[in-house]
Amino acid sequence: MTENFWRELPRPFFVLAPMEDVTDVVFRHVVSEAGRPDVFFTEFTNSESYCHPDGKDSVRGRLTFTEDEQPIVAHIWGDKPENFRKMSIGMAELGFKGLDINMGCPVPNVAGNGKGSGLICRPAVAAELIQAAKAGGLPVSVKTRLGYTDVDEWREWLTHILKQDIANLSIHLRTRAEMSKVDAHWELIPEIKKLRDEVAPDTLLTINGDIPDRQTGLKLAEQYGVDGIMIGRGIFTNPFAFEKEPKEHSSKELLDLLRLHLDLHDEYSKEEARPYKPLPRFFKIYLRGFRGASELRNQCMNTKSTDEVRALLDDFERKYLDGIE
């Protein structure tokens, strides 16, 4: 194995969770500006697409990163060991510091086909994928859930994964069936940590689920002794979730982050075509909590280009500048 960066991280370390159509190079840079985590993951990258003769072009945008994002981990999914073997070698050549396997995605057309969280029902395949992913020499990690249907599945499933000699295990503390509809099962953390200590003490343990910010994560790490904290959906309500010294943020700061997002979208679109259509989903992150935010957000949702959004922001700031705090 090449250098295992996980071992060099502070304790606890903080990770921005991989999120489909969210954690691309553009949004990661916005988060880094607002408050940087210790580790970045890419979006979900389909190993089958990557290994298809024409596939590398289709996933190139998902694998775009810059060196100032290091350490960054390629987050991949699929169910064919040979594809994982090829992809692990390719990710090492691209300069990624680690490879993370998705065993938690609950989306029906993924899980229902035995991929993502569907691998919980295919433990032998899951083990094969992990071993194949080690071919490139990168530290291999896994992101998964407590179980597929029942919470009680966690012990057998996590024991199996911990026996595979992985660098880090990130656990979304819900089952596939629960999606995100129930509270994360924080109450299981002590038992899960005990299991890790017994089965694979060298594997780092990262928890995920209902953790809104660094401060909450620090309390959980102190209480339970886990190694890492992963924040996902919390970033949508607080783009400053990873900041080390929490403080009140002005509306101007939020608008400036949105402008940065627009600028980065345009910049990276020059390298790889990036459709505008997914961009408005991010507006709710920045356009909230200040006078006129709701109306401005509704206007921005109907735009067709970044320049249209900038024009609306310019107009808004001219009208409300004195009220922006």
UniProtKB/Swiss-Prot annotation:
Its cofactor is FMN. Keywords: Flavoprotein, FMN, NADP, Oxidoreductase, RNA-binding, tRNA processing, tRNA-binding. Its EC number is 1.3.1.-. FMN binds at P18, M19, E20, K143, N208, G209, D210, G232, R233. Pfam families: Dus (PF01207). The keyword Glycosyltransferase does not apply. The active site is at C105 (proton donor). GO terms for molecular function: flavin adenine dinucleotide binding; tRNA binding; tRNA dihydrouridine synthase activity. It catalyses: a 5,6-dihydrouridine in tRNA + NAD(+) = a uridine in tRNA + NADH + H(+); a 5,6-dihydrouridine in tRNA + NADP(+) = a uridine in tRNA + NADPH + H(+). It comes from the Bacteria. Catalyzes the synthesis of 5,6-dihydrouridine (D), a modified base found in the D-loop of most tRNAs, via the reduction of the C5-C6 double bond in target uridines. PANTHER family: DUS-LIKE FMN-BINDING DOMAIN-CONTAINING PROTEIN (PTHR11082:SF25), TRNA-DIHYDROURIDINE SYNTHASE (PTHR11082). Belongs to the Dus family. This is Probable tRNA-dihydrouridine synthase 2.
